[in-house]
A protein has these predicted regions:
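Short periplasmic/luminal acceptor-recognition loop of GT-C membrane glycosyltransferases, typified by
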Residues: 425-457, 484-491
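Perimembrane helix-loop-helix junctions
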Residues: 143-154, 205-244, 365
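Membrane-lumen/periplasm interface segments of specific transmembrane helices
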Residues: 233-290, 301-302, 306, 443
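Transmembrane alpha-helical segments
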Residues: 370-371, 383-410, 453-455
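Transmembrane-helix motifs of polytopic, lipid-linked glycan transferases
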Residues: 80-101, 139, 143, 319
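Hydrophobic/aromatic-rich transmembrane helices and adjacent perimembrane loops
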Residues: 124, 131-134, 205, 332, ...
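Membrane-interface alpha helices of multi-pass inner-membrane proteins
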Residues: 110-111, 185-200, 342
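Transmembrane alpha-helix segments characteristic
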Residues: 10-14, 109-110, 310-315, 321-346
Length: 685
């Protein structure tokens, strides 16, 4: 055991150092979500149903770091945690291979295969759940193999019971009485799987190879027929009890205690999470199989993963018969593992490399054992180890350079775009961006918290008509508060996924570009083109209220610009502008402004009215946003329904002084069934 611990202590720090030296500065959507959650949310809101433990773990790490004087985001803390877990996982895998093959070369090459795999390496330098989960899975794999080979000890004897005609006990069997019992191994397996499930819910799938390991443990030295079922039940309980306590206890505590669900329907809806959306899963067709090939290749290496994967499969094919001499349980446990995880993720999302990390340890275990089979002193075959060496050595520079490129913020289009958008916006402005990581880059990197996307709108509402209304409400809220709105051209008309790539969120939701563009059609007259920078995606802009006040004013033939109306109903008119049917005390109130009285000499307004009432009034809102007769200007409308331009002299107007935080226009004093159309309003210097 000391030998294996030495291998672990040698390998783990090497790969942990490699990961720490290659930490990414370009994050995935999920990674930024975790970082922002840990940085900003209270601990009660950190329990994601699909990876229940990761948010609280991050919060605990950040809290401990703050106590030691750490300042800033949890970003690097969480990355360092993943890097250390990744290194420990590689070291543990190397120790397992040394235990099974008795070859240090096999252990070293297996460690290099796992540690240099693109998916494993990338998620060891990112803020994601998969590396920590993989550590528990590797430890669980070790226990499953131990359990499959561990016989029951006979009371009063130092060695295991040997069935009549059976082989002599191996050295591992002879120490069974001194080592862990089958029940202890089963309990350890249940505990490790429970922890893996808390870091990613899909690791409930490990129960299938786990049950195979339990069955093999029973078969290693079958108990007497009369006690067989009792022994099986005891072993199953030893495994299931910690698994149930860890997983069931955690979910019940969070769901019923922390989150406060008061019905089982709500609780199970929360636990099911993404599975209820319909965006993932579905029939396995040719397109999914093509994405499967892409996902598996990129899991191993990017680029060149397909070629290296074929080389590894060749090692398996050429030496598969030799796997028959592998330690008991290796084939049945690993093949069950690969079949179950593979079937689920082919159905769920085959192109996503993060989901294939869980299948790397059993796959590489088979490959290494095929290249380094137990030989009983016979010389090793040469082709397998040589091909394995070439493959492993090729993965290191290929994936290392790819990860460094991907993690370089200066090469990241989304980071460059976020920085450029910050230069064209204020912190309170609303930014509607294409689906993807940009909606998180903006709040995290450039302090633009009001960033939303089509995907966010659909999640908030559940259906496209409601999502469209939600988007318009957010736009109106921003404009009414005096802020600008920036809308990506690709958000107005979402681009389809490139050939061979996974469908976009809009495509998953069944939304075509024309349908989305129709939602933004009412805004088109008011949109102003904006180019954030050379070579960057195009945007459109709805200017902020202050910008319009200091510039061209408000053209109501193009939009409402955040002005609010009270005491009037919408109307129709053949004349251009904002048509209203006045009721009692009709008013139009501007967004918040900061007007300098000395800067403007007149207020010009063009409007038409066919009402009997012809008295109009404009108020200059005080520092509290309140209107007062003493801070207003009255005038009478010209006779007739035609539109007229009125120029009001502000130089001697009552209240046109001091702090002015907005305008209120009363186009007429009261309604009488007629219509008022306000065409435009501006402040003249």
């Amino acid at each position: 055991m000391r030998r294996y611990a030495t291998i672990l202590l040698l390998i783990a720090p090497l790969f942990a150092a490699l990961y720490l030296l290659t930490l990414t500065s370009v994050h995935t959507f999920d990674a930024l979500s975790y970082i922002l959650d840990v940085d900003r949310k209270p601990w009660r809101e950190l329990f994601h149903p699909h990876h229940l433990a990761y948010g609280p773990l991050g919060a605990g790490i950040r809290l401990a770091a703050l106590g030691l004087g750490w300042q800033g985001s949890a970003e690097r803390l969480l990355q360092a945690t993943n890097a250390l877990a990744g290194g420990l996982g590689v070291g543990l895998f190397a120790a397992l291979l040394a235990r099974l093959t008795r070859h240090w070369q096999a252990a070293a090459l297996g460690a290099l295969l796992l540690g240099a795999s693109y998916a494993y390496w990338y998620y060891a330098v990112e803020v994601e759940v998969y590396t920590i989960a993989a550590l528990f899975l590797i430890a669980a794999l070790w226990l499953m193999l131990e359990l499959a080979q561990r016989p029951a000890s006979v009371p009063g004897s130092a060695v295991a019971h040997v069935p009549p005609g059976g082989p002599a006990p191996s050295s591992s069997h002879r120490v069974a009485a001194r080592g862990a019992t089958r029940a202890q191994l089963a309990a350890g397996l249940g505990l490790l799987q429970g922890l893996a499930v808390l870091f990613h819910q899909t690791n409930v799938l490990l129960s299938f190879p786990g049950l195979v390991a339990l069955w093999l443990g029973l078969q290693a030295t079958p108990p007497a027929a009369s006690a067989r079922w009792r022994a099986a039940l005891a072993l199953l309980c030893a495994y299931a009890t910690p698994l149930t306590l860890v997983v069931g206890g955690a979910y019940l505590w969070v769901g019923l205690g922390v989150s406060g669900f008061r019905s089982w329907e709500a609780f199970f809806g929360w636990v099911a999470g993404y599975t209820t959306t319909g965006y993932w899963g579905g029939a396995v067709d040719g397109a999914k199989l093509a994405l499967l090939g892409q996902g598996l290749a990129r899991t191993i290496a990017w680029p060149g993963g397909a070629l290296i994967g074929l080389a590894l499969l060749m090692i398996l094919a050429l030496n598969f018969r030799r796997l028959g001499r592998a330690p008991r349980g290796v084939l049945s446990i690993t093949l069950t593992w690969l079949a179950v995880y593979g079937a689920f993720f082919i159905w769920w999302e085959p192109e996503n490399i993060e989901f294939w990390i869980a299948s790397l340890p059993p796959f590489y275990l088979l490959v290494v054992l095929a290249a380094y089979p137990p030989t009983s002193g016979q010389p090793l075959p040469r082709l397998g180890p040589a091909l394995l060496l070439v493959s492993a050595l090729a993965m290191l520079p290929i994936n290392g350079s790819a990860i460094l490129r991907r993690g370089d913020a200066t090469r990241d289009l989304q980071r460059v775009t976020a920085t450029a958008l910050a230069a064209h916006s204020a912190p309170g402005d609303l930014l509607i961006v294409p689906d993807g990581v940009l909606e998180l880059y903006l709040p995290f990197y450039v302090e633009r918290p009001q960033a939303i996307s089509l995907n966010q709108a659909m999640i908030a509402t559940g259906a496209w008509p409601a999502a469209c209304a939600w988007l318009h409400a957010r736009i109106e809220t921003a404009l009414s508060a005096g802020y600008a709105v920036l809308i990506a051209a690709d958000a107005i008309r979402p681009l389809p996924a490139p050939p061979g790539e996974p469908p976009t969120p809009a495509e998953r939701m069944g939304l075509d570009p024309a349908t989305v563009a129709e939602c933004y059609a009412p805004l088109q007259p008011a949109l102003e083109p904006l180019t954030p920078g050379p070579g960057l995606p195009a945007y459109y802009r709805l200017p902020a209220a202050q910008e319009l006040a200091n510039g061209p004013g408000w053209d109501f033939t193009r939009g409402r610009w955040g002005w609010r109306v009270t005491g009037a109903a919408p109307a129709t008119s053949s004349q251009p502008g904002w048509a209203l049917r006045p009721e009692s005390d009709p008013t139009l109130i501007s967004p918040p402004l900061r007007l300098e009285p000395a800067r403007f000499t007149a207020l010009e307004v063009r409007l038409a009215a066919d009402t009997a009432a012809r008295d109009a009034q404009v108020f200059f809102l005080d520092g509290n946003g309140q209107a007062d007769e003493a801070r207003s200007l009255r005038w009478r409308l010209e006779p007739g329904p035609a539109a007229r331009t009125y120029r009001l002299d502000l130089r001697a107007a009552p209240g046109w002084e001091g702090v002015i935080t907005g305008l209120r226009l009363d186009p007429v004093s009261t309604g009488d069934g007629g219509t008022v159309v306000v065409e435009w309003l501006r402040l003249a210097p």
